[in-house]
């Protein structure tokens, strides 16, 4: 999937914006990924979370990349630490690159990235103990308002991307749908309610061309085949699930493979 967004350059000239997107990492990020990015030279990198179960290696590596980065942490990034200390350390390492519940404008190249709720595990709305320890008892409506407020702060001349760990509710209730529950019967819509509500409200003020997320792995459980990873709704919003897991592999000739959505 090529993220072919349009970016304003001066008053009249426009060009395509090339964005690399790293799905759920699950500790699979190393020097080869960094070398690949240097060779591809994208305008920026988006990361949808589940970096490395609360460890600092990957957040530190992302912070040192020589290109614009926006990231939102996933449910595994709490490191099974209910005190929130592990989560706090990762947030500190990522600094302004983490855009959960916030806005990160990448200048250059000229892209407004708004983050969804950090550390979500999907399934409607729920805050883990680690999230409550770090952010307090944020209710559903407040989460919606945080996402909307961040989007409305964005420069209207910049293309807008919503970056989340779990995608929104409303994309289907079958196991193979972009946010469909595949690990337990019956299958159901496992998307985030707050993100879906935020998208609807943001549209009252500006278009939402692209929503990027992960969490729901492409390969379905129990031999269920492959998940639908891309769709477009009637309002023209594109939804891209980037959770190709594992993202490191080898081809039939034994050559290394590294997954990036593009």
PLM segments and residue spans:
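Active-site environment of divalent metal-dependent phosphoester hydrolases
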Residues: 26-32, 52-57, 76-83, 105, ...
């Amino acid at each position: 999937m090529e993220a072919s967004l349009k970016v304003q350059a001066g008053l009249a000239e426009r060009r395509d914006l090339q964005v690399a997107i790293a799905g759920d990492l699950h500790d699979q990020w190393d020097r080869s990924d960094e070398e690949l990015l240097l060779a591809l030279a994208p305008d920026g990198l988006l990361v949808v979370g589940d970096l490395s179960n609360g460890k600092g290696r990957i957040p530190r590596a992302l912070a040192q990349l020589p290109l614009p980065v926006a990231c939102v942490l996933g449910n595994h990034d709490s490191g099974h630490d209910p005190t929130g200390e592990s989560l706090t350390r990762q947030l500190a390492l990522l600094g302004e690159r983490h855009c959960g519940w916030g806005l990160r404008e990448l200048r250059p190249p000229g892209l407004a990235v708004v983050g969804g709720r950090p550390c979500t595990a999907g399934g409607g709305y729920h805050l883990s103990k680690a999230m409550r320890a770090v952010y307090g008892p944020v209710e559903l409506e407040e989460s919606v308002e945080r996402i909307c407020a961040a989007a409305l702060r964005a420069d209207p001349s910049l293309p807008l991307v919503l970056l989340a760990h779990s995608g929104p509710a409303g994309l289907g209730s079958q196991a193979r749908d972009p946010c469909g529950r595949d690990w337990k019967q019956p299958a159901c819509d496992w998307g985030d309610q707050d993100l879906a509500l935020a998208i609807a409200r943001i549209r009252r003020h500006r278009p939402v061309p692209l929503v990027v997320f992960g969490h729901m792995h492409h390969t379905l459980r129990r031999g269920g085949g492959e998940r639908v990873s891309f769709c477009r709704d009637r309002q023209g919003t594109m939804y891209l699930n980037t959770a190709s897991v594992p993202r490191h592999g080898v081809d039939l000739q034994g050559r290394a493979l590294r997954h990036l959505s593009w």
